[in-house]
């Protein structure tokens, strides 16, 4: 299976970026993960990063290929909930962070996904959205009940109120699972935070992704979302995967223009490493 992958995360107009995204590739497929740390709680970025790390550990410990993707998704999301709570208790003082979560397993020509909160998974085919997750949010419930129109969802004053999350509460979240989807060549799977989809409509996203390299189109969409959301633009994060070929189903390869955006923690670690190296060099010169 040959795929094209791109991801991007922009800070928007916020003080820091609490979104995190992960891409895990293995012989039989790939796992895409996205978490939007809750800004109304302390350490949202910790919750989102813990989500990514929990899935990394789970995939490393899983038989290959993943025997039951739905069981893997639900079990790992519930484990992430407990890991986030534990990470919060280790802080001084202890905190109760939370994050949204949307995760997709792509394996042997099929896709399975699960989500908690309002970060979305889309499946685009020929530029058209044939599936998207339903937000676990107050505004989505209003829309489902016919109390507001679809056009009002992204602008409603309570659009950021979610009804489920990973972490924050002692009670485990209810994980919503998709059905298994058979993929075809050209299909594009998109995971994104509300900072991305909130300023763009589905038709606009699908049309753009269907024309050009994912790296270029995804960057353009993210930058457009930030511009439209300014001066209060949220963190804007997305990862997209395109099926180039379904041949060689027992082996997955990603083409060379995969675009990986370094998250802030990695940048901070690199800066500290450079500073330590400079300090060590100065000490040696003084000696």
Model feature map: region roles:
Residues 1-287:
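PP2C/PPM-type serine/threonine phosphatase catalytic domain
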């Amino acid at each position: 299976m040959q795929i094209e992958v791109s991801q991007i995360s922009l800070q928007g107009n916020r003080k820091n970026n609490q979104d995190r995204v992960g891409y895990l590739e293995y012989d039989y497929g790939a796992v895409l993960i996205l978490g939007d740390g809750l800004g109304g709680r302390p350490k949202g970025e910790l919750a989102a990063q813990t989500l990514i790390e929990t899935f990394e550990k789970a995939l490393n410990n899983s038989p290959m290929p993943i025997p039951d993707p739905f069981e893997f998704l639900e079990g790992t999301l519930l484990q992430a909930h407990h890991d986030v709570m534990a990470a919060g208790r280790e802080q001084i003082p202890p905190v109760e962070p939370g994050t949204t979560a949307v995760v997709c397993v792509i394996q042997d020509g099929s896709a399975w996904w699960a989500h908690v909160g309002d970060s979305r998974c889309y499946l685009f085919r020929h530029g058209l959205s044939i599936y998207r997750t339903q937000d676990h949010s107050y505004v989505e419930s209003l829309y489902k009940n016919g109390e507001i129109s679809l056009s009002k969802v992204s602008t409603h004053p309570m659009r950021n109120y979610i009804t489920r999350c990973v972490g924050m509460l002692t009670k485990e979240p209810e994980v919503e699972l998709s059905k298994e989807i058979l993929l075809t060549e050209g299909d594009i799977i998109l995971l994104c935070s509300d900072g991305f989809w909130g300023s763009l409509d589905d038709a606009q996203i699908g049309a753009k992704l269907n024309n050009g390299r994912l790296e270029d189109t995804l960057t353009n969409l993210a930058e457009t979302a930030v511009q439209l959301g300014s001066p209060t633009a949220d963190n804007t994060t997305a990862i997209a995967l395109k099926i180039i070929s379904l041949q060689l189903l027992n082996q997955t390869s990603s083409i060379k223009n995969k675009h990986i955006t370094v998250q802030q923690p990695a940048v901070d670690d690199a800066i500290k490493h450079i500073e330590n190296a400079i300090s060590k060099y100065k000490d040696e010169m003084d000696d």
